[in-house]
């Protein structure tokens, strides 16, 4: 009699292999969250704890039911649905080598297609909305000063959420050519220059008593790295406060990615070339040599000089369809 393959054993080997192959922490956490969500659904559907599930029970109809539940009952977007399916497909490609006797089951799962979706126009904040958001935190409190610095850096640099929460104090380089050193997707290192106003706020923030031992630039109240939920909480909190002086924010959801788009639009409005914007946002390969990093930093500093600081007066610019398509691809 063939002993059934447990799902737990396969999943553990799958994530161990990801770590051994040095997959990015972002990919690992995304796949982890996908399977957490999936296993909660399976537990409710099959009424079995995840540790007792066999691989054979995870078939295509069950996965399709999970994907449908994401959209119909959990309010997930098509992109989120496809992201969860990507994680499941990756696991089943691994299982094809670990459990070849289940090849028919595996092929049926791998045949589940991603959904097509209509790309919407890029959403970003206007200058008055940005100014209202930056003014919202109460800077008489520790958390307010942290949030103000966090928002200012996000707006001025266009860093990704994982890049913002992963910043260390040592990543802030002050003095001549002040910049943030960032390791983005694919472990590509890049340098993002800082405006003088942003640098002044960060210098003041560094003088605050450090919380925790992890040297995180923007820690939680417990001194730990901010969670995704924690970041969205502070963004929503300050958006609601900013609505009092800028009512248009009531109709917008503020996320770190939307602030990233806002920075990209600021650069476009300043006439910065799209190739430089892509380089700024980490969408171009960055050589790890110091010479290339310094050259990249100088190019970005010239781009930064063309933008306006918060409270500045923007110019008028109407991007063409190709530019909007470029922004949508970020």
Where does each model-flagged region fall?
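Conserved catalytic core of the tyrosine transesterase superfamily
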Residues: 1-330
């Amino acid at each position: 009699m063939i002993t059934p393959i447990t799902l737990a054993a396969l999943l553990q080997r799958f994530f161990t292999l990801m770590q051994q192959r040095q997959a990015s922490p972002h990919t690992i956490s995304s796949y982890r969250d996908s399977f957490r969500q999936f296993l909660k659904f399976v537990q409710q559907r099959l009424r079995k704890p995840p540790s007792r599930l066999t691989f054979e029970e995870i078939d295509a109809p069950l996965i399709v039911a999970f994907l449908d539940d994401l959209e119909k009952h959990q309010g997930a977007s098509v992109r989120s649905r496809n992201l969860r399916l990507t994680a499941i497909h990756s696991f089943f490609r691994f299982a094809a080598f670990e459990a070849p006797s289940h090849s028919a089951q595996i092929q049926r799962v791998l045949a589940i297609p991603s959904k097509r979706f209509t790309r919407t126009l890029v959403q970003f904040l206007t200058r008055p909305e940005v100014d209202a958001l930056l003014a919202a935190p109460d800077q008489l409190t520790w958390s307010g000063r942290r949030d103000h610095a966090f928002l200012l850096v996000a707006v001025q640099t266009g860093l990704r959420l994982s890049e913002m929460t992963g910043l260390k104090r040592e990543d802030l380089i002050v003095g001549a050519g002040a910049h943030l050193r960032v390791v983005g997707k694919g472990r590509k290192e890049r340098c993002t220059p800082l405006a003088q106003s942003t640098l002044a706020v960060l210098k003041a923030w560094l003088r605050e008593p450090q919380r925790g031992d992890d040297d995180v630039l923007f820690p939680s109240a417990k001194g730990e790295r901010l969670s995704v939920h924690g970041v969205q909480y502070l963004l929503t909190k300050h958006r609601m406060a900013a609505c009092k002086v800028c009512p248009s924010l009531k109709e917008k959801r503020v996320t770190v990615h939307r602030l990233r788009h806002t920075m990209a639009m600021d650069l476009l409005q300043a006439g910065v070339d799209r190739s430089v914007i892509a380089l700024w946002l980490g969408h171009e390969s960055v050589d790890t040599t110091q010479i290339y990093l310094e050259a990249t930093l100088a190019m970005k500093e010239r781009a930064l000089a063309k933008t306006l600081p918060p409270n500045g007066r923007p110019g008028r610019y109407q991007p063409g369809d190709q530019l909007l398509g470029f922004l949508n691809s970020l």
